[in-house]
Amino acid sequence: MASFTAEVKDELSRVEGRCPTCERAQLSALLRVCGTLSFKGTGRYALRITTETGAVARTIIKLVHDIFDLNTSLTIRRSVLHKTRNYLIELAEQDGLEEALVELGILVPGQGLAAGIPRALLQKRCCREAFVRGAFMAGGFIADPRGDFHLELAVTGEDFANELAVLVGSLGVHARLNRRRGAYAIYLKSFDDIVTLLVAMGAARYAHTIEGVRAIKSVKNDVNRRVNAELANQNRAGDAADVQRSLIDDAEQLIGLSALPRAVREFCELRRANPELSLAELGQELTPPASKSAMYHRLLRLQSLVDEARAASGAEK
């Protein structure tokens, strides 16, 4: 079964760029985040791209062919241990590869690998969204929303990570950057930020899925709060009933139940017979029924009589 991350990436692979520059921006991010560039000599390069997601591999190959008409090779390897597939795309040294890398903002002529993001490709919002979409497809993770809400992009290179975090933030979300084992993670924890970014990247269907999960979580949490409140009320009612029965025992020893006023005696008999009921429920056992307030006044009267009996007993001693 595909992971939630793989499902989101599959949806993103079906998003078409709104303009030709969008496709270049997306491909630039895909190659920059999950590609490895090899220098073969002056003006000669080769590129290897690895991914565990078939949809990502298909997107890279399609964009490379459609935009630059470069030759690619694909090797699919299966991990017996992890039961996953690994896709290796190779662009061997060939005419046009260096020019393509320069056009994508990955190479700077005469300087080597570009440190930051390709700003020339990111002048329009749709192109910025496409670049972030490519970065997520290449190095992104999103937790199954049935657990915690968490989305992150794993990248290398401090300048690239810092500029990408700012770019993600420009799409209307609060992105945080954390260094992790020599790499960098740009992450979102807010539900609203995650939904906003998914929509911006083009994964509207999964944004709606997450909203539905949150609604279900909200209902479950509300039910849990009500159940916990009811249990707490029952516990408090049980504690109160224990105190009342202890008071009744004192009344029986100090006064005698038969000597109590009829209404108070009825209260004592009912409480002993129904230790689990609240005062309001206890009142409903009378004929005619009595209110919670009436039962409370009977309890207060019992307390007063017991206090008087205790005082009198102490005076006699």
Q: Residue locations for each model-derived region?
A:
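Short, hydrophobic/amphipathic alpha-helical patches that form generic packing surfaces
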Residues: 25-33, 130-138, 269
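DNA-contacting interfaces and partner/effector-binding or oligomerization modules
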Residues: 57-58, 62-83, 88-211
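Extended mid-to-C-terminal alpha-helical interaction segments
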Residues: 196, 200-302
